[in-house]
Amino acid sequence: MDYGMISQIEKARLYAEEPERITFKTLNSTFRGDNNTYVISLDESGWHCTCPGFQSHHICPHIMTIERLLKPMLKIAPVPYAPGQNVVSDVKKMHRYAEEIDRIVFNSFQVSIQGNNSDHSVGYDQGTWTCDSNSFRLRGVSSHTIAMERLLKGMLREQVAT
């Protein structure tokens, strides 16, 4: 019996129950909206979406949905409503989209996780995980990557493809 792995699974459960330990640094996702499929990203300059609503108002129901789903893990202020934005329609869409997570696929992201002993960097890119923890270097998996898999269940590229 691999007691080290059992410990990693238990830590992952605890980390997933405390999503405020996690900070998204960057992300790239595909979002299947009602009319088209869009690419949403977050980087040091802020949010971006390829939808027409974002191009005109710098906010859209796609970003609002991601903000809602990842709220405790985003350490930035939500994008404010914009003049001319159809707020009622966008909020309704956001609520519906948040219940339909099969619309969202995370292609890549970079997060920082406050571990029990130190902070760790976790990356995900098209199904490939990276983590700077010793357990990841030894096993190719860690409590940090398992926690992210739990939190983003059904929205990761390899989970959607299978």
Can you name each region flagged by the protein language model?
Residues M1-T162:
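Long, low-complexity, compositionally biased intrinsically disordered regions
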